[in-house]
Structure formats: structure tokens, C-alpha cells
């Protein structure tokens, strides 16, 4: 086999072809494109890594056995074979292939692919701890983008586990154990939302340093003034200078620490917003989309609580259906404890073409297509008044985290109204007053709605 590398480490999709120059239908990527920035899943297809297979290893031929002689195996072949096995539902055999690939001195790209797909196998089998260990190695040693983990539907069940929450927190804090790429992305978004924070922190640090230097020269003068004698500086004046310097240092350091605290809080909120944007929904046409794909199109209203409470709120909302639809409201009911296994988790890597079509964010540049008038019109036509959650456990975890951050007891009945740009507009205990919401939210064709996008 020949491997054609490209500048981008995370943009690579294995493809099999019957010869070196003719391609056939694309298979599931080793890794989804991981270099997309947060809150923007737009992808650049200018550079890829392609894996070419000779005619002896074409799709029609049977995959090599894991017990084949080592001389005939390469890490690349094992990864491709593992993907084929996963497509056929043989997760255990696929796991063996990825482990074999790691034992064959793989290059960094093959190592990244093997560890990532091995983690997906563990996640499929419910082995959260092993999945975290593989992902941590890929993040730390092989430059895996954390956005890849957030975007991959094969890891939907894993993202609902407490192990993922721990991994996400580690990635947010950064460090040698997990790498800093996710934290760097968060900092970039934080700077966009608070563009002058970096400038303020610089001046706080500079003023504190200046006061410290001044204090360094003031201390000897203060000692000399206290001792007195000929030529000693005025004690009152020197004490005043020292007090000003100390006060300046305290104030500047306090402001610097306050800005750091606000930045950390903002990055936590950005992390939650990013997690929310990747939660899947099933529209009335049975099409599965991520919440981020509905931006600028609807205002999701999440209703979380006991089944009776949510059902009653949905019935009341139906009385204001026309007004709410004019305002782009999409109801998303989440019933506590209703954990159904979604289809996309069962299918794993080998999702059928029908499933792949229903989730256009996998393996195709959805955002670019969605910008076209035709695609947007089609999506709007599929959106009705209500959507069904996919991976309810993942939705519950996000809502409970949001409740904790807002000081609400986890498990209480709550509602969360999102803006057109995907951020939280407001939230509250209990269920919303639909008449009030109809007055509060502007119609979709209103100027205020255009400014909200």
C-alpha cells in the first residue's frame, strides 16, 4: 500500500480503490475532520490523507485474519481491516485489529487513527475507562483535536458517561497529560467574546510590575526615614509613597485575578455551549441533526422534567402553536430517566447509507451545503413544532450541569430558551408561560431576530 500524506494531520479519510488511480465509494474516516474550530463545523477539503489499497486488498477480498504472519501486516492494513470489521458488526475483532496496528510500529498518523478508533470500539462496548485512556493518548501524543470527539456520533453514548465529563474538564484545563489544543480553541473564542480582556490583563500586570519596582526603591528610603538622622527622607512622605505602591499592587493583582476568574468561567460556559450544540435531535421527518445545524433557523425551547409536567406543558404550548411557530420556536421535551438507546449508537462505524443521509454532519461538509438556499429551504420544511431527543442521557447530563451552574437542584423541572445563534437566552424553574413567551420573542422576520443571528 502507499500512503499519500498531507499537511493537515487530522484531515484524513481512508478510501479503498481497486488500483492506485481509481477511487470508489468513500468509507468511514479513520477520524472525522478534527481541525474545525469550535462552534463552526465547516470543513476544508483541500487536503486529506488517502489510504490506497492494492487490488489484492480490494473491498471484494476478505480481510486478513489477525493471526496472519506479521510480515504480511502493516499498521495501515490493520486499521482499514478494523474499520471493515466494525462495519459488519464484529466490534471485538475490529478491536483486535486496532491493537495489532499499534504493535506494528505505526507512524504518528496511523497511531492517531488506531487509538481513536480503538476508543470508539471501547465506547461501543460500554468500556468508558478504556475509551478515555485511548483518547487521552491520542490527544496528548498524536495531536488529536478535542472537537473531533465532540463531533463524532459514534461517541454519543460515551459523551453521556461521567468519564467523558472528566476528560472534557481535563481538556479545558490543559496540561501535559492531555495537551493544550482544546484550551487554545476555548481561549480564542473567549477573546472574541471579550476582545479587550487581554489588553486589560496586560495593563494590570504592567501597572502591578511598575508599582513593585517603585516599592523596591521605596523600602530602603522608608527604613532610612524611620531611623532618622541627617539627610533622612521625610517619614510621612515616604510612608505615603509606600502605601500608594502597596495599594496599587493589591488593586492591580486583584483585578488581574478577577479577569482570570471571569475568563475561566467564560470558558466553562463556552464548553457547555459547545456540548449543547452537538446534541442530536430527530425532526418530524425522522431526520437526525445536531443542534448546531439549526442555528439561525429556530429557537429551541428545552422542557426538562417529569413526564406529566412536560406533557402538560406541551399541551399548553399547542394552544399558542401559530404564534410560537411565527417566532421560530421548536419544542424539545426531555423527560428525566427516559434513556433510550438511539439507532446511531447501535450502528457504530458501519452505519447504513440511510442513517448517514439522516445525519449530514458525518463525513460531509454540511455547513457549506446548508448555506445554499435550496438546502436551507429543505431543512426549514422538515422542521415542525416539536423535535425528539436522540441520546437522552447526553441531554440529561448537559441539563443537570446547567442546573448546577445556575444554582438549581439537579432533577428539578426547568425550561431553557435558546437564541437563534445557539446560546442560552434565559432559563427558569418549572414550565414556561407561553403567552409571555409569545410576547417576548420577536417574529422571525423582525429586525430584532435578524440582529440575534
UniProtKB/Swiss-Prot annotation:
Any one GO CC term of the record: chloroplast thylakoid membrane
Function: Chaperone required for efficient photosystem II (PSII) assembly. Binds to psbA during de novo biogenesis of PSII.
Quaternary data: Interacts with psbA, but not with psbD, petB, ALB3, LPA2 or LPA3. Is not a component of the PSII complex.
Each TPR repeat, start to end: 75-108, 112-145
Segment annotated as transit peptide: 1-92
Residues annotated as transmembrane: 202-222, 238-258
Assigned keywords, A-Z: Chloroplast, Membrane, Plastid, Repeat, Thylakoid, TPR repeat, Transit peptide, Transmembrane, Transmembrane helix
Note: Accumulates even in dark-grown seedlings.
Membrane topology reported for the UniProt record: Multi-pass membrane protein
InterPro entries linked to this entry: LPA1-like, TPR-like_helical_dom_sf, TPR_rpt
Gene3D superfamilies according to UniProt: Tetratricopeptide repeat domain
Location in or out of the cell: Plastid, Chloroplast thylakoid membrane
Name of the protein in its database record: Protein LOW PSII ACCUMULATION 1, chloroplastic
Pfam family, one: DUF3493
Disruption phenotype: Pale-green phenotype and greatly reduced growth. Disturbed thylakoid membrane systems.
GO BP term (any one): photosystem II oxygen evolving complex assembly
Amino acid at each position: 500500500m502507499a500512503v499519500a500524506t498531507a499537511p493537515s494531520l487530522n484531515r484524513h479519510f481512508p478510501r479503498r480503490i481497486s488500483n492506485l488511480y481509481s477511487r470508489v465509494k468513500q468509507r468511514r474516516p479513520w477520524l472525522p475532520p478534527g481541525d474545525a474550530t469550535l462552534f463552526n463545523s465547516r470543513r476544508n477539503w483541500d487536503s486529506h490523507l488517502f489510504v490506497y489499497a492494492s487490488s489484492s486488498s480490494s473491498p471484494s477480498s476478505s480481510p486478513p485474519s489477525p493471526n496472519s504472519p506479521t510480515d504480511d501486516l502493516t499498521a495501515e492494513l490493520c486499521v482499514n481491516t478494523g474499520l471493515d470489521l466494525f462495519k459488519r458488526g464484529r466490534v471485538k475483532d475490529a478491536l483486535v485489529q486496532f491493537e495489532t496496528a499499534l504493535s506494528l510500529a505505526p507512524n504518528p498518523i496511523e497511531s492517531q487513527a488506531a487509538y481513536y478508533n480503538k476508543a470508539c470500539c471501547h465506547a461501543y462496548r460500554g468500556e468508558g475507562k478504556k475509551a478515555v485512556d485511548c483518547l487521552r493518548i491520542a490527544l496528548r501524543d498524536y495531536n488529536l483535536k478535542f472537537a473531533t470527539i465532540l463531533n463524532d456520533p459514534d461517541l454519543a453514548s460515551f459523551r453521556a458517561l461521567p468519564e467523558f465529563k472528566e476528560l472534557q474538564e481535563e481538556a479545558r484545563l490543559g496540561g501535559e497529560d492531555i495537551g493544550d489544543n482544546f484550551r487554545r480553541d476555548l481561549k480564542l473564542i473567549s477573546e472574541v467574546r471579550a476582545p479587550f480582556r487581554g489588553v486589560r490583563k496586560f495593563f494590570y500586570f504592567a501597572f502591578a510590575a511598575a508599582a513593585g519596582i517603585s516599592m523596591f526603591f521605596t523600602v530602603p528610603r522608608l527604613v532610612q526615614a524611620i531611623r532618622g538622622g541627617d539627610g533622612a527622607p521625610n517619614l510621612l512622605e515616604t510612608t505615603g509613597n509606600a502605601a500608594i505602591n502597596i495599594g496599587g499592587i493589591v488593586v492591580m493583582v486583584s483585578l488581574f485575578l478577577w479577569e482570570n476568574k471571569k475568563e475561566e468561567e467564560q470558558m466553562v460556559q463556552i464548553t457547555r455551549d459547545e456540548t449543547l450544540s452537538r446534541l442530536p435531535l430527530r425532526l418530524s421527518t425522522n431526520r437526525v441533526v445536531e443542534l448546531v445545524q439549526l442555528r439561525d433557523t429556530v429557537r429551541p425551547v428545552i422542557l426538562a422534567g417529569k413526564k406529566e409536567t412536560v406533557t402538560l406543558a406541551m399541551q399548553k404550548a399547542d394552544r399558542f402553536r401559530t404564534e410560537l411557530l411565527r417566532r421560530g420556536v421548536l419544542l424539545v421535551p426531555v423527560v428525566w430517566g427516559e434513556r433510550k438507546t438511539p439507532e446511531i449508537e447501535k450502528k457504530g462505524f458501519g452505519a447504513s447509507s440511510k442513517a448517514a443521509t439522516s445525519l449530514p454532519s458525518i463525513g460531509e461538509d454540511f455547513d457549506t451545503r446548508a448555506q445554499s438556499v435550496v438546502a436551507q429551504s429543505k431543512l426549514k420544511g422538515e422542521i415542525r413544532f416539536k423535535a425528539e431527543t436522540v441520546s437522552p442521557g447526553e441531554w440529561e447530563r448537559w441539563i443537570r450541569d446547567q442546573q448546577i451552574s445556575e444554582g438549581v437542584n439537579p432533577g428539578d423541572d426547568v425550561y431553557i430558551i435558546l437564541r437563534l445563534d445557539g446560546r442560552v437566552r434565559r432559563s427558569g424553574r418549572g414550565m414556561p408561560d407561553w403567552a409571555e413567551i409569545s410576547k417576548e420573542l420577536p417574529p422571525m422576520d423582525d429586525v430584532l431576530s435578524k440582529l440575534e443571528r
